[in-house]
């Protein structure tokens, strides 16, 4: 494993992968599915405090779903995602396409049975550069026009901008579907 994972718990490793905005995170109270779109509904809110190991533990244990804003206070990102809201989605075919194109991506099932396709980076990069690269990759995969995270290329910290969060994978890691 990379040096920054050595000696860390699974929760700490997960938190290291999903670094982003430090001063707030998203929370979701899961509701019913929309009958027409099949998108999972729920009540989303911003929790205006830093994430902790306990926050990530609760997510992984299936107690409280959380989301992270990929862009940090310095307008840098170490991960991003392509949000594919297509139902039904053939996840196996998508993974095969990623493998065929030899793209360094991780495909995860979203809460609505779409996909979040993650790109993790070794070092932080400008949000704008990551966003442009993910748009290019989405088009290459045949999903041009999908939502891209980070959604913002710049946060004005002095104004209190928080950006948009993405729900993290592995909610209820032992018994969940994502």
Across the structure, where does each feature detected by a protein language model lie?
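Broad hydrophobic/π-residue packing in well-ordered secondary structure
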Residues: 24, 115-121
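Residue-level signal for beta-strand positions within conserved beta-sheet cores that form or flank
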Residues: 103, 113, 164
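DNA replication initiation on ssDNA origins
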Residues: 2-79, 88-95, 164-165, 170-175
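Short secondary-structure junctions
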Residues: 23-27, 103-107, 145-146
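Short, conserved phosphate-binding/catalytic loop or strand-edge motifs used
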Residues: 107-116
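DNA replication initiation modules
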Residues: 59-95, 100, 121-178
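Short, structured coil/loop segments at alpha-helix boundaries
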Residues: 7, 109, 138-139
């Amino acid at each position: 494993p990379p040096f920054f994972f050595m000696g860390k718990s699974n929760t700490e490793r997960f938190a290291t992968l999903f670094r982003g905005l430090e001063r707030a995170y998203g929370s979701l109270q899961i509701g019913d599915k929309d009958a027409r779109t099949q998108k999972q509904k729920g009540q989303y809110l911003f929790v205006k405090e830093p994430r902790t190991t306990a926050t990530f533990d609760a997510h992984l244990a299936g107690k409280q779903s959380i989301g992270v804003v990929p862009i940090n206070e310095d307008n840098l990102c170490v991960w991003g995602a392509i949000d594919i809201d297509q139902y039904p989605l053939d996840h196996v075919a998508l993974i095969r396409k990623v493998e065929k194109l030899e793209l360094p991506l991780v495909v995860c099932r979203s809460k609505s049975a779409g996909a979040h396709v993650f790109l993790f980076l070794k070092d932080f990069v400008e949000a704008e550069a990551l966003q442009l690269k993910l748009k290019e990759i989405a088009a290459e995969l045949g999903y041009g026009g999908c939502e891209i995270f980070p959604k913002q290329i710049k946060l004005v910290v002095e104004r209190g901008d928080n950006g948009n969060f993405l729900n993290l994978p592995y909610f209820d890691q032992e018994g969940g579907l994502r």
